Amino acid sequence: MSNPAKPDDSVGPQTQLGWLNGYRSAVSLTFDDGMDCHLDPVIPILEDHNLRGTFYPVAKGNWSETETSLPYLERFRPAVENGHEIGNHSIHHWCSCAARLDLESSDVSNHTPAGLEYRTLAELETELDQACQRFEAIFPEITLWSFCYPCYNTFVGRGTSRYSYVPLVAGRFFAARGGGEMSNLTNSPYHADLHCLMSWKCENRKADDLIELIQRTNRDGGGWNIFTFHGVGGGHLSIEQAEFEALCHYLQREKDTVWMAPLVEVALQLHQWRQQGN
């Protein structure tokens, strides 16, 4: 999943609003894990409000290079055809196991635990390459891909053997979304790492809370808020459907002030603005 024109993170001093073409801020709504609720009710709600989202399903299931079928991904084809973004969320969805109080069973042949603490960069490299093969086989028309770090984790190993796998992602994808450890997770057009973008977790949040984040960014001018959803109206890490609908209603109402677009589209515009020497 190569991208010959990869983002350059260097920018110079100029008004932040320049990259937004007159909007006060940008917003991307992202949805992790390819849940059933993303197909219904999320996509119909988005389309009822003339909004487009970014969906990160996992390329799980049996597959070989001679096959071009993977039902878990193919069910998102109508979303792609309607202008939504589909991004890569890996195959095995490896996460940190640091909080587990039992011995996690292995899912690899060397019988080590499955958490990122026990993975290597070589294993992540293979995981990313194989995931790229699967996504590209199912959606060959997509030329610009983004990646979503499972569980927001961007590392492998522990202690002196702990390494970031962000560089591996940067070599394969145009942009990538993580989480963030700061109190303010709005992405700056000057400083944001397009291969480790920060995002706001939305589980158990109220629409008013998320709207206030957008309004605060509008007052400051020029930032990019990325919201991460899992369950909507049910499922794990869920937000109530009514709260999600209220957020979508706000974004539709503020369409002349807030640029709401899929993650890879916002990343591309920011990249192009930076390439102009801004």
What does each of the following model-derived ranges do?
Residues P41, W63-P71, C95-L103, N110-R205, ...:
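Catalytic domains of cell-wall/extracellular-matrix polysaccharide-remodeling enzymes
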Residues N50-G53, A59, V108-S109, A170-R172, ...:
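Short, surface-exposed linear patches
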Residues G157-R158, M198-E265, Q269:
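Catalytic grooves of carbohydrate-active enzymes
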Residues H271-N278:
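Surface beta-strand/loop "capping" patches
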